[in-house]
C-alpha cells in the first residue's frame, strides 16, 4: 500500500474524511482535493488532540480562508514535534510529498503517544478551554474534567482511535443540534467535551447526546467497520457499515409497526364506539389506518426474512420493489384522507382530547393523536434516507445494488406524489367547505365526489391570453373557479356539462406540451394548459372515461389538427341534454348533410311537402326560420319499402331537387351575410359553418395606427368578433363602475362643501352677533 492510500484509509478510519462510494483511481489527486481547504486537517487535529483548534472555517470560500485552516492545523502539529510543511505546498499542490510526510509523522506520533498520554495534559486543555468560556466555574470544571478525562483516556485506549459507545437509555432531542438515540444504538463519538455532553454520529446524522446515557463497547463487541481498524491494516478504501445500517432499518421498522399497532388498539378502535363523533366523522378520522398498520407488519416480516440470508444474498431492495404497488395504494389513500382527518380533529378537538386522556394518554391528549396520525408521512420520508445510507455502504457488485437504487427513486417519487395529493385534497376541502363567490345553480356539495382537481391555465376561443383557473371534475359536470384577488376565496367562472363535450389532445403540436382543448354543443372552445404531464394524463384519462360512459355522447379525439368545427358559445347555465334525446354526433360539414332523410311513416311524406312549401315562403322573410328547421332535421331515420316507392315518384324527386337547390343557395349566401351583415347576433353562433377553405378579407387597425388587410377564415372571424364583443362589454362595465364612483365622489364632495359653507356661515353670524353686543 503506497503512502497516499495509507493516508486515505487512516483519515476514513478516524471519521474525518467521508468514505467514497466508488473505488479511488488516483489517491493522490483525491487527497489533494480533499485536503486543499484545510477543513479535514482541522477535524483531524481536533480528533487526535481535542481542543487544539477552537474555531475554523467549515465552508471556506476564499484562498485566505483555506490558508488559515491549514495554519491552524500546523499549529496543532507543532506540539507533536513533527516536521511540518508550508501551507502553499498543500494549497498549490506543488510539493505534496512534504504534506504526506507530515501526515505520516503525525500518525506515527499519535500512535506512539496514545498509551502514554497523561491525563493532566488533556484535562488542562479542557480546563483552559472552559475557563475561557466560563471563568467563574473554571476551578470546579477543572476538577470534574480531571475525573472524567481519565475515564475517557481509558475508553480511547481500547485498541482504536475511534471511541464507540452503546446507548443504555432512550434519549429524545430537544434542540436541532442534539442527537436522538434509542436503547441499544451504536454511536461513533466524534467529539468529547466537558459538561456531560458528547458529539457522535448515528445513521449518518451527527449531534450531541448525554455521556452518562451510553457505555463503552469492548473490542469484541464492535462491528466490523473502518473506524474499528487500527493503523493501516485494512486495504480497501470503501469499507462500510452495511450490517449495522441494515439492522437499524429492521429495528426502526419494528418500532414503527409497534407504534401503529399500539395507537390502533389503545385509541382508534375504542374511538369507534364513542358517541361524540358520528360514523362519518370516525371513518374520516381513521381512513385506512388499519390497513396501513397491517401492511407495515407484513413489510417488517418480509424484511426480517431477507436479513436471514447471507449478506451477499440480501434482497432488501427487491423486497421493497415487489411491495411498492401496495405502498402506493396504501399511502396515497392515506394521504388523500388526511385533510379530512385533520378537519375532524380541528372541529372536535375538545372531545377528542378528553377521550385520549380518559384512555390514558398524557396531556394534551389531542397532540398525541395528531402526532401519531402523521407518523406514516414521517416514516415515508425516512425510507429514502435509510436506503441511501444502505446503498452508500454497499458494494457496486452486490446483487441488490441496482434494486436499492430503483427503490430510492420509487420512494422519492411516491413521497412527491403524496405531498402533492395532500395539498390538492386540502385545497379541495377548503373549496367545498367555504362559500364560493358568484356561485350559480345547486350547491356544490350536491354534485357528488370530486373525481379530479388541479390548477391549470386556460384560453377562451381565439384569445391568446392565458388565465389561471381551478378545474374540479364531478361525474356530470366540470366546474371552473378562479382565486380571488387577495387569495382569500374562490370565484365561480362557469360549469361545463360532460355530456356533449369533445376533448382533443394538442400535445402533438410543437409548443403545446400538456395541452388539450374542450369543445361541444354548449361549450365555447377552451384550451387547457396543464402544469405537468402527470396532471395532463390524469385529465385525459378521467374525461375520456366519463365521456365514453353510457350516459355520454362524445368520444375523445386524439387528432391534433386545428379543431374549429362545432364551436358554440360557453354558458355557465347551459344544461345537458335529456336522457331521451338522441345523441348528437359531430361530423364534418358538407352539402350532402342537407339532403332530407326519409320520414318514418309513408303518410308523413305529404305533410312534409306541405311544410316545406310553407317554409320556403317564410324563408324569404326570415332566414332564421330556415336555420331552425335545419337544426331539427338532424335526427336520422330508417327508411322502409313503402317510403322507397313513394320517393321513387318523379314528382317527389323533382320537388326534392328544387328544395335542395334553395337550401344550398341559402347556405352559400351565408358567407356574404356574415361578412357584410349589420351586426353579430348576441348569444348564438351559426349552427351551420362553412368549410375553413372559404376566407374573408378583413381590414384591421393595429395599435400603432397602421391599417392592414388580412385574410381570415369564417370561423376565426366569428370568434374574433365574439372576443371583441366580450371585450367591449367588459370595457362598458368598467366605464359604468368608474362613472358610478365618479358620481359618488361628486355627491360626497357636494355634501362636504355644503357642510363647510354652513359652518362658515354660522361662524360669520356668531362673530357679527358678538360685535353687536359689544357696541354701546
Curated annotation (Swiss-Prot):
InterPro entries: AlphaPIX_SH3 (IPR035788), CH_dom (IPR001715), CH_dom_sf (IPR036872), DBL_dom_sf (IPR035899), DH_dom (IPR000219), GEF6/7_CC (IPR032409), PH-like_dom_sf (IPR011993), PH_Cool_Pix (IPR046376). It comes from the Eukaryota. Keywords: Cell projection, Guanine-nucleotide releasing factor, Phosphoprotein, SH3 domain. GO terms for cellular component: cell-cell junction; cytoplasm; cytosol; lamellipodium. GO terms for molecular function: GTPase activator activity; guanyl-nucleotide exchange factor activity. Residues 121-151 have a biased composition (Polar residues). The modification Phosphoserine is found at residues 126, 144, 150, 225, 488, 640, 684. Residues 160-219 form the SH3 domain. It is found in: Cell projection, Lamellipodium. One of its GO terms (biological process) is apoptotic process. Residues 1-111 form the Calponin-homology (CH) domain. Ubiquitous. Residues 443-548 form the PH domain. Residues 241-421 form the DH domain. The modification Phosphothreonine is found at residue 133. Residues 561-572 have a biased composition (Low complexity). Residues 115-151, 561-581 are annotated as: Disordered. Acts as a RAC1 guanine nucleotide exchange factor (GEF). Interacts with PAK kinases through the SH3 domain. Interacts with GIT1. Component of cytoplasmic complexes, which also contain PXN, GIT1 and PAK1. Interacts with PARVB. Interacts with BIN2. Identified in a complex with BIN2 and GIT2. Interacts with PARVG; the guanine nucleotide exchange factor activity of ARHGEF6 is essential for PARVG-induced enhancement of cell spreading. This is Rho guanine nucleotide exchange factor 6. The gene is ARHGEF6.
Amino acid at each position: 500500500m503506497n503512502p497516499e492510500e495509507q493516508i486515505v484509509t487512516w483519515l476514513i478510519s478516524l471519521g474525518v474524511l467521508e468514505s467514497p462510494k466508488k473505488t479511488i483511481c488516483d489517491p493522490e489527486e483525491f487527497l489533494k482535493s480533499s485536503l486543499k481547504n484545510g477543513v479535514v486537517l482541522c477535524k483531524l487535529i481536533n480528533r487526535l488532540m481535542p481542543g487544539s483548534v477552537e474555531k475554523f472555517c467549515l465552508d471556506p470560500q476564499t484562498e485566505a480562508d483555506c490558508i488559515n485552516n491549514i495554519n491552524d492545523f500546523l499549529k496543532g502539529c507543532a506540539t507533536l514535534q513533527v516536521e511540518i510543511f508550508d501551507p502553499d505546498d498543500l494549497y498549490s499542490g506543488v510539493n505534496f510529498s512534504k504534506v504526506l510526510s507530515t501526515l505520516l509523522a503525525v500518525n506515527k506520533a499519535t500512535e506512539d503517544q496514545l498509551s502514554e498520554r497523561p491525563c493532566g495534559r488533556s484535562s488542562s486543555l479542557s480546563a483552559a478551554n472552559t475557563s475561557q468560556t466560563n471563568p467563574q466555574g473554571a476551578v470546579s470544571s477543572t476538577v470534574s474534567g480531571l475525573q472524567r478525562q481519565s475515564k475517557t483516556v481509558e475508553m480511547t485506549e481500547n485498541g482504536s482511535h475511534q471511541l464507540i459507545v452503546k446507548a443504555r437509555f432512550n434519549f429524545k432531542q430537544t434542540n436541532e443540534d442534539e442527537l436522538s438515540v434509542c436503547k441499544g444504538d451504536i454511536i461513533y463519538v466524534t467529539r468529547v467535551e466537558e459538561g456531560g455532553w458528547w458529539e457522535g454520529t448515528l445513521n449518518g446524522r451527527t449531534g450531541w447526546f448525554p455521556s452518562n446515557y451510553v457505555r463503552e463497547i469492548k473490542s469484541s463487541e464492535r462491528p466490523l467497520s473502518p473506524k474499528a481498524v487500527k493503523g493501516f491494516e485494512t486495504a480497501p478504501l470503501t469499507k462500510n457499515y452495511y450490517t449495522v445500517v441494515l439492522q437499524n432499518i429492521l429495528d426502526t421498522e419494528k418500532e414503527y409497526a409497534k407504534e401503529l399497532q399500539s395507537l390502533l388498539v389503545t385509541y382508534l378502535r375504542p374511538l369507534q364506539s364513542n358517541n361524540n363523533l358520528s360514523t362519518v366523522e370516525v371513518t374520516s378520522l381513521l381512513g385506512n389506518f388499519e390497513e396501513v398498520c397491517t401492511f407495515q407488519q407484513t413489510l417488517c416480516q418480509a424484511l426480517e426474512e431477507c436479513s436471514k440470508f447471507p449478506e451477499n444474498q440480501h434482497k432488501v431492495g427487491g423486497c421493497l420493489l415487489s411491495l411498492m404497488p401496495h405502498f402506493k395504494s396504501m399511502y396515497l389513500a392515506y394521504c388523500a384522507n388526511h385533510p379530512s382527518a385533520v378537519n375532524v380533529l380541528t372541529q372536535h378537538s375538545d372531545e377528542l382530547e378528553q377521550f385520549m386522556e380518559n384512555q390514558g394518554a398524557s396531556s394534551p391528549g389531542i397532540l398525541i393523536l395528531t402526532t401519531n396520525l402523521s407518523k406514516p408521512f414521517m416514516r415515508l420520508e425516512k425510507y429514502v434516507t435509510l436506503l441511501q445510507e444502505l446503498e452508500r455502504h454497499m458494494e457496486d457488485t452486490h446483487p441488490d445494488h441496482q434494486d436499492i437504487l430503483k427503490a430510492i427513486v420509487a420512494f422519492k417519487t411516491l413521497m412527491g406524489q403524496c405531498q402533492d395529493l395532500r395539498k390538492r385534497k386540502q385545497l379541495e376541502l377548503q373549496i367545498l367547505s367555504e362559500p364560493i363567490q358568484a356561485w350559480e345553480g345547486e350547491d356544490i356539495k350536491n354534485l357528488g365526489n370530486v373525481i379530479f382537481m388541479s390548477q391549470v391555465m386556460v384560453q377562451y376561443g381565439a384569445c391568446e391570453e392565458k388565465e389561471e383557473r381551478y378545474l374540479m371534475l364531478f361525474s356530470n359536470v366540470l366546474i371552473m373557479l378562479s382565486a380571488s384577488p387577495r387569495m382569500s376565496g374562490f370565484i365561480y367562472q362557469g360549469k361545463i356539462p360532460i355530456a356533449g363535450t369533445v376533448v382533443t389532445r394538442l400535445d402533438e403540436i410543437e409548443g403545446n406540451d400538456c395541452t388539450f382543448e374542450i369543445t361541444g354543443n354548449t361549450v365555447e372552445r377552451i384550451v387547457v394548459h396543464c402544469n405537468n404531464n402527470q396532471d395532463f394524463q390524469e385529465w385525459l384519462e378521467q374525461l375520456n372515461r366519463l365521456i365514453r360512459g353510457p350516459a355520454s355522447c362524445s368520444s375523445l379525439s386524439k387528432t391534433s389538427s386545428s379543431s374549429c368545427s362545432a364551436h358554440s358559445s360557453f354558458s355557465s347555465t347551459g344544461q345537458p341534454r335529456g336522457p331521451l334525446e338522441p345523441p348528437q354526433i359531430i361530423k364534418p360539414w358538407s352539402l350532402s348533410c342537407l339532403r332530407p332523410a326519409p320520414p318514418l311513416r309513408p303518410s308523413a311524406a305529404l305533410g312534409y311537402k306541405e311544410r316545406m312549401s310553407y317554409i320556403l315562403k317564410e324563408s324569404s322573410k326570415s332566414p332564421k326560420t330556415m336555420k331552425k328547421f335545419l337544426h331539427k332535421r338532424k335526427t336520422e331515420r330508417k327508411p322502409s319499402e313503402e317510403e322507397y316507392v313513394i320517393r321513387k315518384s318523379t314528382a317527389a324527386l323533382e320537388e326534392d331537387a328544387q328544395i335542395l337547390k334553395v337550401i344550398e343557395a341559402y347556405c352559400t349566401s351565408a358567407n356574404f351575410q356574415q361578412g357584410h351583415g349589420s351586426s353579430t347576433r348576441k348569444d348564438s353562433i351559426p349552427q351551420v359553418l362553412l368549410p375553413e377553405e372559404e376566407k374573408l378579407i378583413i381590414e384591421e387597425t393595429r395599435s400603432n395606427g397602421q391599417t392592414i388587410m388580412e385574410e381570415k377564415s369564417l370561423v376565426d372571424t366569428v370568434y374574433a368578433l365574439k372576443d371583441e364583443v366580450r371585450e367591449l362589454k367588459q370595457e362598458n362595465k368598467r366605464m359604468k363602475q368608474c362613472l358610478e364612483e365618479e358620481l359618488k365622489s361628486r355627491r360626497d364632495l357636494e355634501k362636504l362643501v355644503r357642510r363647510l359653507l354652513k359652518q362658515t356661515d354660522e361662524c360669520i353670524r356668531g362673530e357679527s352677533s358678538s360685535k353687536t353686543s359689544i357696541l354701546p
